[in-house]
Amino acid sequence: MPVLILFLFISLLMPNAATYADTDKLVIAHRGASGYLPEHTIAAKAMAYAMGADYIEQDLVMTKDDRLVVLHDHYLDRISNVMSEFPERYREVNGKKRWFAIDFTLAEIQGLRVSEGFSVDDAEIGGGKAAFKANYPTRFPLFKSRFSVHTFEEEIELIQGLNKSTGEDIGLYPEIKAPWFHRHEGKDISKEVLRVLKKYGYTTKNDLVYLQCFDPNETER
């Protein structure tokens, strides 16, 4: 049932859905060009655009100061150096330490270094001494070059700017992440996502945007 609700929700929002033939295909860049560059970085999104994606995905979570940032998880410890920069600012959830984006300001988050995804033994976490293990060893090396977290607004401006300079018309594919968690923390992430989309002109079914959420209660709002 949740999958059906999600499908219906996306179908209603899909631009010009009835105009696509059965043989048409859409290329949706999942987390950007995440097989080549660290996921959800501006570099990964620019590369996905250059590779010819029709839509580019944005997973969205909120910061302590109510900004939308592009992250697959609502925590930071899988893709950044947050553990060494803020070793004490974690929450323990089911016996596991997690550094949640909602506990940091945008400025603090954008000061972190972003990497290809990794895992770490929980017993080794603390003081920046943990041994990171790449989740996908053949992808971009861990903590090489310089990448950071960016806002939803920054990514929209990148895509709209490239649309203008290239003459293409590439769409957005935002996902509202963990709305239940944000509500528990007193934040209405869905309302903020809709506000930002409206700010940048995405207001009708004909606009090039999919809006997705895997929480059926949230889609019914």
PLM segments and residue spans:
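Bacterial N-terminal signal peptides
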Residues: 3-15
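Phosphate-group recognition and catalysis centered on beta-loop-alpha active-site segments
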Residues: 17-221
